[in-house]
């Protein structure tokens, strides 16, 4: 197959070596210290044997923190993820493109679904934008929600109405 196969990843998940994957996207938000939500959440995922795929500003945050360097990042990984990364020669956080390349992540989820026979909504994957700050993050999130994948936005949107509106 020209693009490879998802079978090794599926075997890691079904055997319990990996617990799943998180697709993390989004720019920094002025409401929080830059990169802090991205990096804090990524480190928590890694220690729990959850591989992270990321794009755009979230990917830049990971790179700046050394999470895309296999040697530097392995200290944050649980035993299962550390072993997978060592065997495959990959970092625990994988860069998948620019900020609006969520389609690449969803193509991967669709391939995992096809190869496993499990609906996308039942795969151990989630989407999140821990520091989102723009409308494009909401539209990307809606795309992920439409597939049935659980999706989380980290900063509450300012949606309070005026006291003049009943």
Give residue ranges: language-model regions:
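Anaerobic metallocofactor- and corrinoid-dependent redox/one-carbon enzyme cores
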Residues: 1-166
């Amino acid at each position: 197959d020209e693009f490879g196969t998802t079978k090794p990843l599926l075997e890691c998940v079904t055997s319990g070596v990996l617990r799943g994957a998180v697709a993390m996207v989004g720019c920094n938000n002025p409401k929080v210290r830059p990169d802090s939500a991205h990096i804090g959440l990524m480190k928590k995922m890694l220690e729990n044997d959850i591989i992270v795929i990321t794009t755009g500003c979230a990917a830049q945050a990971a790179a700046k923190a050394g999470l895309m360097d296999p040697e530097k990042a392995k200290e944050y990984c649980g035993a299962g993820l550390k072993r997978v990364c060592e065997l495959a020669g990959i970092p625990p956080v994988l860069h998948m493109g620019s900020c609006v390349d969520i389609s690449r992540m969803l193509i991967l989820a669709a391939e995992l679904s096809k190869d496993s026979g499990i609906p996308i909504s039942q795969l151990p994957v989630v989407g999140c934008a821990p520091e989102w700050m723009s409308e494009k993050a909401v539209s990307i999130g809606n795309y992920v929600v439409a597939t049935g994948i659980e999706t989380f936005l980290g900063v509450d949107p300012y949606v309070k109405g005026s006291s003049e509106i009943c």
